[in-house]
Amino acid sequence: MEYKDPMHELLSSLEQIVFKDETQKITLTHRTTSCTEIEQLRKGTGLKIDDFARVLGVSVAMVKEWESRRVKPSSAELKLMRLIQANPALSKQLME
């Protein structure tokens, strides 16, 4: 059986607590930026929320969650949004 130093275990647990809080702060900051970007992107394309959802292959409710900052889109969804932003004609092709 492996001996575990109690002091080492305590310090390790404290580090996990401290770094967990830092990770959440970073995630929340990124999350806010992404969601604001999503709302701006959708409005910039001129698409209604239901058309934007259809282009991305998600529900209208999901787009509303992103825009209200309750849910973060996946990296694949973010990439598709950026492609649409770079090439607005792509959204029309995806709707066909």
UniProtKB/Swiss-Prot annotation:
DNA-binding residues (ranges): 49-68
InterPro entries: Cro/C1-type_HTH, HTH-type_reg/antitoxin, Lambda_DNA-bd_dom_sf
Keywords of this entry: DNA-binding, Transcription, Transcription regulation
Keyword Acetylation: no
A GO MF label: DNA binding
Domain HTH cro/C1-type residue range list: 38-91
One Pfam family this sequence matches: HTH_3
Gene3D superfamilies per record: lambda repressor-like DNA-binding domains
PANTHER family attached to this UniProt entry: MERR FAMILY BACTERIAL REGULATORY PROTEIN, TRANSCRIPTIONAL REGULATOR
NCBIfam families per UniProt: PRK10072.1
Protein name: Uncharacterized HTH-type transcriptional regulator YiaG
Organism field: Escherichia coli (strain K12)
Gene: yiaG
